[in-house]
Amino acid sequence: MACLQKISSAIDYDCSNGFVGFSQVAMINKADIQSFVVDASKTVTALNIGSGVPYGVASQKKGFSVSETVRVNDGAPNAYVHEVTVTVYEKENPLLFNQLANGDVVFIAKRSKYCRVYGLYYGLQPTASSMNSNENGGWATFTFTTPEGVLGEDYLTVKDTVYTSIFNAVV
């Protein structure tokens, strides 16, 4: 009976509570970021992308996932390595695939209670991609990681006004 209760609670699970992933994700070309401000609490309070355009990323059903590990630095504070995996649901777009394979990007991701930014200091660069016509509907996945040879990223949140301005411009 306990098994049935668990299945029932999984079916009735409220996906909007923030434990199941991100509700919105935007990808920004690192080169489009003209300036940003991070306050003492490690919150991004300003982000200027000039005429750059943020792109919406599908975040449902593992379409966007993040992992973070600590990079131990000798003679400098430890920092984080961000690794972001994105599923591209568009199958036939050579221009998009080539841009992603050569990109240097930043991601802003919204959960129900907070918003995070990944790759703000150094950008995230492609480290892997996978396209298999026989698996997962033939979709492609791309993995972006903090570059080697840099200190790493801080754990940063994003102020609501910054989040709103970026997501209002998403295409």
Model-derived regions, located:
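Mixed-charge, glycine-accented linear interaction segment located at domain edges/termini
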Residues: 120-171
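Extended hydrophobic/Leu-rich segments
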Residues: 33-36, 44, 86, 163-170
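Solvent-exposed edge beta-strands and adjacent loop segments
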Residues: 2-81, 124-135
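Intrinsically disordered, low-complexity segments enriched in small/polar residues
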Residues: 11, 53, 87, 116-120, ...
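Oligomerization/assembly interface segments of phage tail-like spikes and tubes
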Residues: 68-93, 136-151
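Short, hydrophobic/proline-enriched secondary-structure or compact coil segments at domain edges
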Residues: 20-31, 84-88, 104-112
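Generic detector of leucine side chains in alpha-helical contexts
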Residues: 4, 47, 95-96, 100, ...
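Short, acidic/charged, Gly/Pro-enriched secondary-structure junctions
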Residues: 92-118
